[in-house]
Amino acid sequence: MLPSIAKHAALHQVNPLKKHGQNFIFDSSLCDKIVRASNLAENSRVLEIGPGTGGLTRSILQKNPESLTVIETDARCLPLLNEIKEYYPNLNIIKQDALKINLTDLSYDIVNSVGFAYKKREVKPITNRRANDIGESKSIDYKVTIISNLPYHIGTELVIRWLKEARLITSMTLMLQKEVVERICAIPSTKAYGRLSVICQLIAKVEKCFDVAPTAFYPPPKVYSAIVKLIPLENPPSIALINKVEQITKLAFAGRRKMIKSSLKNLVPNIYEVLTQLKINDNYRAENLAPQDYLRIAEIL
C-alpha cells in the first residue's frame, strides 16, 4: 500500500524547488475534485505535465484510464513515480522538459513505444507538415485527455501550444494562476478580456470550474489558483487563421485604449472599409470586439 502523498514525498526527500516552479498538493481530496471536474471517462488516454509528488497522478489512476503518461523534468521525483507505477502498470513516465515536447510527436511515440493502446497501427502519424488545420483528422486514434497542475511560469505558453494541436486532444482540465483562468474565460468589454481570451475561445469551449486557495499547496504561493476546463471545438479555425488572429490581437491589445481603426491601420490599410463591410463599429476598442469579430477580420486579410 502506498503511503500518503506527503509521507511519500518525505520518504524520498523531495522538497519543492523554486527553479521548477513547484508547489506541491498533498490533499488527495482536492486531487480527486480536479479529476471529477475533468469528467474523465474510463479507458481514456491521459497526459499529465509535472506530476511532482504524484498526488494528482494517483487520483487519475484511480479512475482506471487506459494509460496515463506523465512528463516530469525533476529527476528527484522519478523514484517516487516509479513506486506508484508498481501499483499501476498503466503509468508511463517520461523525463523531459514539457516545453521541448511536441504533442503530435509525443502522441505517436507514446502509441508505438511507451504504452498507449493503438488499435489501428496502419494509420500513419500526423506530422507538422500535414497538420495544417487545428481540427483536421477527426479519425485520429490516439487523442489524449490532459489533466495537469501546470507551473505558473509555463502554463499560458503550454495552453496556446496545445490548442494549436487540438485535433489530438479530447479535453484539458488545468490548474493555473487564477488571473490566467479569468483571462481565458473573460467576455468582451471586461478588464480581463484580451488576446488569451480570444485565442482560447476560438478553438475551445472554456469553463472555469473552481478556485483553489494558496493554503492548498506546499509551500503556499502568493496568489490564488483556479481550475479551467477546455474542450476543443468540433470545427475550429485553421492554424493559418489562428496565426493571423494572433497577429491582429497583438496589435489591437497593445494599444488597448485605442480605437481599433487606429491600432490596426498599419496592418490593415483599408481598415475603415473592412470594419464597414463586417458591420463592426469603427469606434470600438480592442476589448469590445468578440472573438468571432477578430476571426472575421483575419478571414479578410
Swiss-Prot record:
UniProt-annotated location(s): Cytoplasm
Reactions it catalyzes: adenosine(1518)/adenosine(1519) in 16S rRNA + 4 S-adenosyl-L-methionine = N(6)-dimethyladenosine(1518)/N(6)-dimethyladenosine(1519) in 16S rRNA + 4 S-adenosyl-L-homocysteine + 4 H(+)
Superkingdom as given in the UniProt entry: Bacteria
Binding locations of S-adenosyl-L-methionine: N23, I25, G50, E72, D97, N149
GO molecular function, one term: RNA binding
Cellular component, GO annotation: cytoplasm
Keywords, ordered alphabetically: Cytoplasm, Methyltransferase, RNA-binding, rRNA processing, S-adenosyl-L-methionine, Transferase
Main subcellular location of this protein, as a coarse class: cytoplasm
Assigned EC number: 2.1.1.182
Family stated for the protein in its record: Belongs to the class I-like SAM-binding methyltransferase superfamily. rRNA adenine N(6)-methyltransferase family. RsmA subfamily.
Function field: Specifically dimethylates two adjacent adenosines (A1518 and A1519) in the loop of a conserved hairpin near the 3'-end of 16S rRNA in the 30S particle. May play a critical role in biogenesis of 30S subunits.
Cross-referenced PANTHER family: DIMETHYLADENOSINE TRANSFERASE, DIMETHYLADENOSINE TRANSFERASE-RELATED
Protein name: Ribosomal RNA small subunit methyltransferase A
Organism, scientific name: Rickettsia conorii (strain ATCC VR-613 / Malish 7)
